[in-house]
């Protein structure tokens, strides 16, 4: 019949070929490569920190000397003033140009070997109060945590920016805490101490110091802060 003729004349439609499925942009191989890159960067950063720490320890082993009686008396008076019963080890060290607090679980205070020749008793007391305030605020532990974060998140510029800004805030907070109890004359003495220490070169990176930055704008900012009305009472301002 007509139906049979129509069926015989109707073109046979062949099935369309299956479209190729899109290839994934992010494959297991690329994920493995990124993980390997992250681990390599983390290992490199950790190695750099360990190298710096070992270099500091070697320098301390060969260049540290006991402090003199004058410095020790001023240090004892500062500890008593700040209510610090457990005194940190205090050593003089050649090769550094600013008082500094080492970073880690067992901190110690390092003083330049010629500090008694460059600072007055009042200026030396200001410098020691600053480092002891770092210790009271546990800044050495915060600094250790920041270093660990830069190991894990070495690829993230926000972490590095946060570390830089927190370090600035740690110094500003210490300045504020030390100068809060000082009168105008004593604050000027503290500012003169900052300027005297900022004029020296900086070569040590594994410590927290009163004037370890070599930037003039940091010196100006902190000297202005000494005479500012705002006093930060928090250990550090968070971004």
Task: Please describe what each predicted stretch is.
Residues 10-16:
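Intrinsically disordered, low-complexity proline-rich regions
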Residues 1:
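Glycine-rich phosphate-binding loop
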Residues 4-8, 20-239:
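Membrane-embedded and juxtamembrane structural elements of multi-pass membrane proteins
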């Amino acid at each position: 019949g007509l139906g049979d003729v129509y069926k015989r004349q109707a073109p046979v439609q062949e099935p369309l070929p299956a479209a190729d499925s899109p290839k994934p942009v992010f494959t297991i191989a690329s994920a493995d490569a990124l993980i390997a890159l992250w681990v390599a960067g983390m290992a490199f950063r950790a190695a750099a920190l360990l190298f710096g720490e070992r270099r500091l320890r070697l320098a301390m082993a060969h260049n540290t000397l006991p402090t003199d009686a004058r410095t020790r008396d001023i240090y004892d008076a500062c500890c008593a003033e700040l209510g610090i019963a457990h005194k940190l080890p205090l050593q003089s060290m050649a090769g550094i140009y600013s008082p500094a607090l080492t970073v880690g679980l067992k901190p110690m205070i390092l003083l330049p070997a010629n500090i008694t020749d460059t600072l007055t008793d009042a200026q030396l007391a200001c410098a020691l109060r600053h480092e002891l305030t770092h210790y009271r605020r546990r800044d050495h532990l915060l600094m250790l945590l920041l270093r660990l974060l830069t190991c894990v998140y070495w690829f993230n510029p926000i972490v590095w920016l946060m570390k830089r800004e927190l370090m600035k805030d740690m110094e500003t907070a210490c300045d504020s805490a030390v100068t809060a109890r000082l009168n105008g004359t004593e604050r000027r003495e503290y500012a003169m101490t900052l300027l005297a220490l900022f004029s020296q070169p900086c070569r040590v990176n594994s410590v927290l110091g009163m004037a370890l930055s070599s930037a003039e704008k940091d010196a100006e900012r902190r000297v202005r802060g000494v005479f500012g009305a705002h006093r930060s009472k928090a250990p550090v301002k968070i971004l």
